[in-house]
C-alpha cells in the first residue's frame, strides 16, 4: 500500500519555506531558482542574508532534481553544505543554478551555484540524497520542478521567528514542534534544521555571519522539538541537533565557520559542551 507524501501544512496555511519566495524553473538539465532578499531574511544585528536560507534554497534546487530523478519515491537528504566567498548581500535578487553531479543506484548528488543580480558569485553548495527507506512512501500525484511564487515578499516576520526557532541560551537553539517543520517524508525538514544549527552557532558570535555550514543527516527527526547545541572556537563551530521528543536522539552533526569580525581575536571556546567539560575551579 502506498503512503501519500505530503509536505504541506494544514488547509489554509502556507508553509514557512514558501514565504522565502524561491521560484524555480527548468532550463535543460539545469534547475534555476531566484528570490528577492528582504530585511526579514537578514541575520539579526547585520545587513546580510542568512547563510541558512542559502542552504535551504540549495536543498530545494537539489531536492527537486532528486524528486525528478527518483519519483515516485521520496528523496531524503543525506548531506548538505553551503560555502560563501564573502558575506552575503543584504538586498537585490539571489539566483541559483542546480545541476546533478552523479545519479547512482542508491545516492544522487547535486551542486548549486549562487550569484547576485550582476552575475557575481555569492557561493556554492552541494547535497546528496537517497530514496526514503520506507518503499511505501511515494508521491501519489504528479510532481513538478517548476514552482512559481506570487510577486512580492511573503515573509512578514524575521525568518527565525516565522519558523518558530529561538535561541534558548548561548550555544543552544530550539525549533518548536509544528506542522510546518515536517517534509514530504514526514520528518523534520532539513532546511529548518540548518536554520536551527545556524542560530545555535551565531548565538555564540553576535554580529557575525556564517561563511560555511555543513550538515550530515544521521537519522530523521520524527517528533520534535529539534534542539541544536553548538561549541565555537576561533570562529569554527561544531553543532549537534537532537530530536527532543524522541529520547534526545542525535539526528544531525554540523560544522560552521563564521566570517572574521573585528571582535574575534583568538576567542576562547564557548558553548554548552565546553562549559560542561571545564574542570571545576578553573576560570
Protein language model regions, located:
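Intrinsic-disorder/low-complexity, polar/charged segments enriched in Ser/Thr/Lys/Arg/Asp/Glu/Gln
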Residues: 29-32, 79, 93-95, 124, ...
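Preference for bulky hydrophobic residues occupying beta-strand positions
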Residues: 35, 80-82, 112, 127, ...
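Hot-dog-fold acyl-thioester-processing enzymes
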Residues: 11, 18-19, 32-64, 174-202, ...
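Short coil/loop residues immediately preceding or within conserved phosphate-binding loops
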Residues: 19, 79, 109, 212, ...
Amino acid at each position: 500500500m502506498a503512503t501519500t507524501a505530503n509536505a504541506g501544512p494544514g488547509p489554509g496555511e502556507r508553509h514557512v519555506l514558501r514565504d522565502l519566495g524561491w521560484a524555480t524553473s527548468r532550463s535543460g538539465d539545469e534547475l534555476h531558482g531566484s528570490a528577492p532578499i528582504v530585511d526579514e531574511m537578514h541575520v539579526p544585528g547585520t545587513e546580510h542574508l542568512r547563510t541558512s536560507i542559502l542552504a535551504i534554497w540549495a536543498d530545494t534546487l537539489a531536492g527537486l532534481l532528486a524528486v525528478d530523478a527518483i519519483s515516485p519515491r521520496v528523496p531524503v537528504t543525506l548531506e548538505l553544505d553551503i560555502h560563501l566567498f564573502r558575506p552575503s548581500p543584504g538586498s537585490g535578487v539571489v539566483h541559483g543554478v542546480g545541476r546533478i553531479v552523479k545519479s547512482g543506484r542508491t545516492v544522487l548528488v547535486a551542486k548549486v551555484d549562487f550569484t547576485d543580480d550582476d552575475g557575481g558569485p555569492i557561493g556554492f553548495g552541494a547535497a546528496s540524497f537517497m530514496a526514503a527507506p520506507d518503499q511505501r512512501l511515494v508521491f501519489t500525484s504528479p510532481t513538478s520542478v517548476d514552482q512559481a511564487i506570487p510577486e512580492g515578499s511573503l515573509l512578514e516576520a524575521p525568518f527565525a521567528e516565522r519558523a518558530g526557532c529561538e535561541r534558548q541560551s548561548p550555544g543552544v537553539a530550539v525549533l518548536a514542534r509544528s506542522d510546518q517543520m515536517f517534509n514530504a517524508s514526514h520528518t523534520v525538514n532539513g532546511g529548518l534544521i540548518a536554520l536551527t544549527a545556524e542560530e545555535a552557532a551565531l548565538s555564540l558570535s553576535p554580529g557575525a555571519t556564517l561563511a560555511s555550514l555543513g550538515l550530515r543527516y544521521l537519522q530523521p527527526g520524527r517528533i520534535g522539538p529539534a534542539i541544536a547545541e553548538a561549541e565555537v572556537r576561533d570562529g569554527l563551530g561544531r553543532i549537534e541537533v537532537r530530536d527532543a521528543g524522541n529520547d534526545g536522539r542525535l539526528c544531525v552533526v554540523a560544522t560552521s565557520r563564521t566570517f572574521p569580525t573585528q571582535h574575534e581575536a583568538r576567542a576562547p571556546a564557548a558553548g554548552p559542551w565546553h562549559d560542561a567539560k571545564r574542570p571545576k575551579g578553573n576560570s
